[in-house]
Amino acid sequence: MNKQREAKVAATQEIKDKLGTSILSILADYRGLNVAEMTKLRRQLREAGVEFKVVKNTLTARAARELGLDGLEPHLQGPTAIAFSATDPVAPAKILNEVVRNSKTFQIKVGVLQGKIIGINEIKALSDLPSREELLAKMVGGFQAPLSGLVNVLAGNMRNLVYALEAIRKQKEAVA
């Protein structure tokens, strides 16, 4: 096998592995972004734990066929980049939707959420969800609230006991 063919097979396998293991992959048409905007986008995605890769449509189509993602091929027209997120489905959706709002030409094509193809509306809905960190903070707050209430109740009982004992002490001093 020649080197060019080996490189294509390796690239196809890499795309297939990432599409198969990612929680969310978003395909986008990155036309119209200048180098500074593309660098900023890559940095934002990297900080969120998302890999952003420009891919060849033919290799992506081959990888999608091997994974059984038949509905992906019609979206593989024009320049394509894929944002692969292995952990958080909300972060790439938020970041890419923000770029769509700020750019005239950048477009989200389609997404793959845990092996199922999702449209632009579903990706926008994902971007409206709170991030993983926000959800964890709310969950911790939810666990803390009952504990704080219990501490206040117990402290209130102790405080009332101290007030009662103080009142008894003052009463005995007044009698004596």
UniProtKB/Swiss-Prot annotation:
Identify a single GO molecular function assigned to this protein: structural constituent of ribosome
Q: Name one GO cellular component term.
A: large ribosomal subunit
Q: Which CDD domains match?
A: Ribosomal_L10 (cd05797)
Q: Which GO terms describe its biological process?
A: translation
Q: Does the keyword Glycosyltransferase apply?
A: no
Q: Which InterPro entries match?
A: Ribosomal_uL10, Ribosomal_uL10-like_sf, Ribosomal_uL10_bac, Ribosomal_uL10_bac_type, Ribosomal_uL10_CS_bac
Among its keywords, does the record have RNA-binding? yes
Record key words, sorted: Ribonucleoprotein, Ribosomal protein, RNA-binding, rRNA-binding
Q: Which domain of life is it from?
A: Bacteria
Known partners and oligomeric status: Part of the ribosomal stalk of the 50S ribosomal subunit. The N-terminus interacts with L11 and the large rRNA to form the base of the stalk. The C-terminus forms an elongated spine to which L12 dimers bind in a sequential fashion forming a multimeric L10(L12)X complex.
Q: What family does the database annotate?
A: Belongs to the universal ribosomal protein uL10 family.
Question: According to its UniProt entry, what is the function of this protein?
Answer: Forms part of the ribosomal stalk, playing a central role in the interaction of the ribosome with GTP-bound translation factors.
Which PANTHER family does the annotation name? 39S RIBOSOMAL PROTEIN L10, MITOCHONDRIAL
From the Swiss-Prot or TrEMBL record, give the protein name. Answer: Large ribosomal subunit protein uL10
Which gene holds the coding sequence for this protein?
rplJ
